[in-house]
Design a protein with these regions (language model features):
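Short alpha-helical DNA-recognition segment
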Residues: 21-45
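DNA major-groove recognition helix of helix-turn-helix/homeodomain DNA-binding modules
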Residues: 50, 54-71
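A short, Lys/Arg-rich alpha-helix, primarily the initiator
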Residues: 1-20
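Residue-level detection of the helix-turn-helix DNA-binding "recognition helix"
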Residues: 18, 32-33, 48-50, 59
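Residue-level recognition of specific faces of alpha-helices
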Residues: 12, 42-45, 71
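Residue-level signal for the short linker/turn that defines the boundary of a DNA-recognition helix
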Residues: 11, 21-22, 38, 53-56
Length: 74
C-alpha cells in the first residue's frame, strides 16, 4: 500500500476507535488478547500513518471495533 492510503486508513481507524469508545491502550490490549503483538505506541503510529499495518491487524481491528472493511478502507 502507498503511504497516503495507509495514512487515510489510519485516520479511519482512529475515528472508528473513538466512536466506539476505545482508547489506544484499550485497543492494543484487545489486539494482544487476539494474538497480535502490538503496543499502544504502535496503534498511535498506525493512526498517523507512520507504521505499516498488516492484514492480520486490520482483520482484528475490524472484529474488535465491529465494523466493516469498507469503513476502514474508505
Amino acid at each position: 500500500m502507498n503511504i497516503e492510503y495507509e495514512k487515510k486508513m489510519g485516520e479511519n481507524i482512529r475515528s472508528l476507535r473513538i466512536i466506539k469508545g476505545y482508547t489506544q491502550e484499550q485497543l492494543s490490549a484487545k489486539m494482544q488478547l487476539g494474538g497480535c503483538d502490538i503496543t499502544r505506541s504502535a496503534v498511535a503510529k498506525i493512526e498517523v500513518g507512520q507504521r505499516h499495518i498488516y492484514p492480520d491487524e486490520i482483520k482484528l481491528i475490524k472484529e474488535i471495533l465491529d465494523v466493516d472493511y469498507d469503513e476502514i478502507f474508505k
